[in-house]
């Protein structure tokens, strides 16, 4: 297969690198301006998708008041009425005509069929040039017909009845959203160019099924609103943004391999201690621990191993009710710039420096006194 060539930018506005398109399906310049239309589609998708992910601030973190809550959905066992994809629905959903191959032929590269009650998409397997597919809010339990879409770049199948994320490997797939399904495990996700994966609002209890050896391009992982109890299995070396809010996480494990992670969301979990962070997480700048069970500021001291940490959220933890909370956190983490969305003032920083220096002097005096006692 010919090497992929860059053609368009990330659809969700969250992947910094350009999407790669197989050379056999590159949009060529011509009278139909197909390349311009595809770029316009990408721009439109950027704008549409912005609201689905956390509202990002200066350092890539969500604005606290804007954080999307994953709704708790009551499952309804329903008898599905077969509703296959028809030629009529197919014609309505196809768009974005582009040149393919040597430029002598044309094919539609975008398909959208949302809220059509679809249970079968077998008809799609003939449309091998599709690159962008949205099948959200249907009744799908099987995505195997998509295995023939080897040019697929972007796939959204939110709000279906999927119980597994397993799919045949697609060589160019870079963005996939499987949010609000019934997925219980995440084995079988092996797309080599996958950069952005959303699995929010499912029933996933463990991340141990993630294939570290094959997801070496993954930059963004969204697992909010699942049933995770631990971070074990998330050892993905290229990961930059990890969203784990609204789970049941009580222990932090396997974080030592996240050397490129810059943003970590752990809001609304069950953490009482902060063991598990390590110095190898040298790029982590933003950490959201809101609404956990952290009762002692001594736990916050364990974050001193994070050399680049600049923004921390501890609201709605018992420790945030302690006297002089902001200053005490700054005493422990002098490089911190923001706490709970608010920048530290100069007077807070000066007071923290004074307290820190005084405590260091007291500790030194105690050590000298202890040494003196031993000598005597």
Where are these regions (language model features)?
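Short, function-defining helix-loop hinge/capping sites that tune catalysis or transport
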Residues: 146, 167, 209-210, 233, ...
């Amino acid at each position: 297969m010919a090497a992929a060539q860059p053609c368009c930018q990330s659809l969700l506005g969250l992947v910094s690198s350009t999407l790669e398109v197989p050379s056999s399906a590159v949009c060529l310049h011509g009278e139909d301006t197909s390349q311009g239309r595809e770029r316009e589609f990408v721009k439109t998708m950027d704008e549409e998708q912005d609201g689905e992910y956390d509202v990002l601030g200066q350092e890539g973190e969500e604005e606290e008041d804007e954080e999307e809550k994953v709704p708790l959905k009551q499952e309804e066992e329903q008898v599905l009425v077969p509703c296959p994809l028809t030629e009529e629905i197919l014609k309505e959903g196809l768009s974005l005509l582009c040149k393919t191959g040597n430029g002598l032929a044309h094919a539609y590269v975008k398909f959208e069929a949302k809220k059509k009650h679809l249970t079968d998409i077998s008809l799609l397997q003939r449309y091998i040039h599709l690159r962008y597919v949205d099948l959200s809010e249907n009744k799908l339990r099987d995505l195997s017909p998509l295995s023939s879409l080897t040019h697929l770049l972007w796939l959204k199948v939110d709000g279906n009845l999927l119980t597994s994320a397993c799919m045949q490997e697609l060589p160019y797939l870079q963005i996939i959203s499987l949010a609000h399904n019934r997925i219980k495990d995440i084995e079988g996700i092996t797309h080599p160019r996958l950069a952005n994966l959303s699995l929010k609002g499912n029933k996933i209890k463990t991340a141990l099924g993630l294939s570290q050896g094959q997801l070496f391009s993954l930059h963004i992982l969204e697992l909010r609103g699942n049933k995770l109890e631990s971070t074990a299995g998330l050892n993905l070396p290229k990961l930059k943004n990890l969203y784990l809010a609204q789970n049941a996480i009580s222990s932090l494990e396997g974080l030592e391999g996240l050397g490129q992670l810059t943003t970590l969301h752990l809001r609304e979990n069950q953490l009482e201690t902060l063991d598990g962070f390590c110095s190898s997480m040298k790029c982590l700048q933003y950490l959201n621990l809101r609404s956990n069970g952290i009762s002692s500021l001594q736990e916050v001291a364990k974050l001193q191993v994070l050399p680049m940490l600049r923004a921390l959220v501890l609201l709605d933890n018992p420790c945030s009710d302690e006297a002089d909370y902001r200053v005490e956190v700054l005493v422990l983490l002098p490089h911190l710039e923001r706490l709970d969305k608010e920048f530290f003032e100069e007077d807070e920083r000066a007071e923290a420096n004074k307290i820190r220096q005084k405590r260091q002097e007291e500790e030194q005096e105690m050590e000298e006194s202890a040494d003196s006692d031993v000598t005597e």
